[in-house]
Amino acid sequence: MAEYLASIFGTEKDKVNCSFYFKIGACRHGDRCSRLHNKPTFSQTIALLNIYRNPQNSSQSADGLRCAVSDVEMQEHYDEFFEEVFTEMEEKYGEVEEMNVCDNLGDHLVGNVYVKFRREEDAEKAVIDLNNRWFNGQPIHAELSPVTDFREACCRQYEMGECTRGGFCNFMHLKPISRELRRELYGRRRKKHRSRSRSRERRSRSRDRGRGGGGGGGGGGGRERDRRRSRDRERSGRF
């Protein structure tokens, strides 16, 4: 019996635990759901709830009419948002394996950002800190998410351009970033790994020669760039 219950846990056959919450980390019924939402006590993934504001869904003029936002402006706005959040997560909390943003319209998914860290400790640290921070004038609501495999959480029909439910689909409609930004963000991480490897090799050679000093001043430029970037973000009023 125990093996059977374990095999159906989080599936449609499970009458106790909510399969949607298990797969997606969100459920349209919320606290009114008749099945249990088992919130994880540890996870690599965090959810930042309703943090992304799609200007195509919210832009209105003073007279209440919807303002047109071009696709180019939309992509630029989204890429800027994605880069800002991704960079903040990596610089403050730890290495990010992947980050995804929901483009759904349902209340339980709209604007949700899912950040999967390489280490569970970094995810836990991020949740604790982010719940005391604000973004774009709003308090951040962060929580650990059960989602670790986004292939199970995504709407396959949407990826093929065939979803008939539109923005109110209960599976994730993930908004893509531009190819250029993807190369920049994830390529930067690969360069960082190579740089760390070379740095370890240099330290090893230095120890072999029995010398320890001389290389401590090279990080000033990077620290200055980090300070400038932090000041720029403060002026922008987002994080």
Swiss-Prot record:
The modification Phosphoserine is found at S61, S145. The modification N-acetylalanine is found at A2. GO terms for molecular function: RNA binding; RS domain binding; zinc ion binding. The C-terminal SR-rich domain is required for interactions with SR proteins and the splicing regulators TRA and TRA2, and the N-terminal domain is required for formation of the U2AF1/U2AF2 heterodimer. Residues 65-147 form the RRM domain. SUPFAM superfamilies: RNA-binding domain, RBD. Expressed in primary spermatocytes and elongating spermatids (at protein level). Belongs to the splicing factor SR family. Its main location: nucleus. Plays a critical role in both constitutive and enhancer-dependent splicing by mediating protein-protein interactions and protein-RNA interactions required for accurate 3'-splice site selection. Recruits U2 snRNP to the branch point. Directly mediates interactions between U2AF2 and proteins bound to the enhancers and thus may function as a bridge between U2AF2 and the enhancer complex to recruit it to the adjacent intron. It comes from Mus musculus (Mouse). One of its GO terms (cellular component) is catalytic step 2 spliceosome. The modification Omega-N-methylarginine is found at R165. SMART domains: RRM, RRM_1, ZnF_C3H1. GO terms for biological process: mRNA splicing, via spliceosome. CDD domains: RRM_U2AF35. This is Splicing factor U2AF 35 kDa subunit. The lineage of its organism: Eukaryota, Metazoa, Chordata, Craniata, Vertebrata.
